[in-house]
Design a protein with these regions (language model features):
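Glycine-rich ThDP/TPP pyrophosphate-binding loop and its adjacent helix/strand module
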Residues: 85-177
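Short beta-alpha connecting loops at secondary-structure transitions
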Residues: 22-25, 85-100, 127-135, 177-190, ...
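Thiamine diphosphate
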Residues: 6-88, 94-101, 145, 278, ...
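A short, basic/flexible loop-to-alpha-helix module at the beginning of a structural domain
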Residues: 256-277
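Iron-sulfur cluster-binding cysteine motifs and their immediate structural context
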Residues: 163-164, 169-175, 193-251
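Active-site pocket-lining segments that scaffold enzyme catalytic pockets across diverse folds
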Residues: 1-3
């Protein structure tokens, strides 16, 4: 968010920012996003806040909290992450498969003052048919400027941030239902000075430390890289881009894997004549 601004977290992915030193504070249950500020705003010297919300929450009950803010004429901006997956429950598609254009029309009908659509694929919005009249599309690099402009508007405004969940992209690429980008990014350890600016710019977990005789440097973990490429926004000459059908070498020995597997006994299955419960970690 812009320097000096304040934001409120949501649930699920929107809550993760609570622990990331991003000037986000407070949270609520699903469907009550923004309600705390609606009440607080009339007693506060703060002029405006941002409220985070996921697309799954929006479909479930979040639209009601936006309606509440509009009815109360509250000056705030809802930031809706349209990441094309209900991450809280396992990455399912949104109920009803609403498009960004449809959401913008719904928000316009609810009385939202202005809608900004921010995306990493701005070329797919060359046709603006079906979008709300009070909506505009921006490249994600302009997100700070857009937030500053919306914070000046009296009333309730909305940002729809359209970018598919990185984990979901990797799943779809492995399944062959999403094209695998031909470009891979690497870091030349001989040039890297370990400043970490690539991590600051991208906030990406695929930038991993690597210890060298000259100290700690950085490398790109290709197994988790989601091909976002924002790491190259870092102020650094060490990045190397390779394009084409690149095959990475295995970092393990097939014979070793087979040797380990040969020593693993088959599981002993219980004789079941009633219900049997198994606890599995994760969602």
């Amino acid at each position: 968010i812009p320097e000096g601004s304040r934001a409120i977290t949501g649930i699920s992915c929107a809550y993760l920012v609570e622990h990331m030193e991003r000037d986000n504070e407070g949270f609520s249950q699903m469907g009550s996003e923004g309600a705390t500020w609606v009440g607080e705003s009339v007693f506060s010297n703060t002029d405006h806040v941002f409220q985070n919300m996921g697309d799954g929450t929006y479909i479930h009950s979040g639209i009601l909290s936006i309606r509440h803010a509009v009815a109360a004429k509250t000056k705030m901006t809802f930031k809706i992450l349209y990441n094309d997956a209900v991450a809280l429950t396992g990455g399912q598609a949104l109920d009803g498969l609403p498009t960004v254009a449809q959401m913008s029309k719904q928000l316009e009908a609810e009385g939202v003052e202005e809608i900004a659509i921010i995306t990493d694929e701005i070329e797919k919005y060359s046709d603006r048919g079906g979008f709300a009249k009070n909506s505009k599309v921006y490249d994600r690099k302009n997100i700070i400027d857009v937030q500053i402009e919306l914070s000046k508007i009296n009333g309730t405004t909305v940002i729809i941030y359209d970018q598919t969940c990185a984990a979901e992209k990797r799943r779809r690429r492995k399944k062959g239902i999403l094209e695998e980008p031909k470009k891979k990014i690497f870091i030349n350890k001989d040039l890297c000075e370990g400043c970490g600016d690539c991590g600051i710019q991208s906030n990406c977990v695929s930038i991993a430390p690597v210890e060298t005789e000259y100290g700690r440097k950085r490398q790109i973990d290709q197994s988790s890289c989601n091909k976002d490429y924002t790491c190259v926004d870092g102020f650094c000459p060490s990045f190397v881009s390779l394009e084409g059908d690149i095959r990475l070498k295995k970092n393990y020995d097939d014979n070793l894997i087979n040797k380990i597997n040969s020593k693993i006994d088959d599981p002993k299955l219980p004789q079941i004549n009633k219900s049997f419960g198994i606890m599995i970690a994760g969602i």
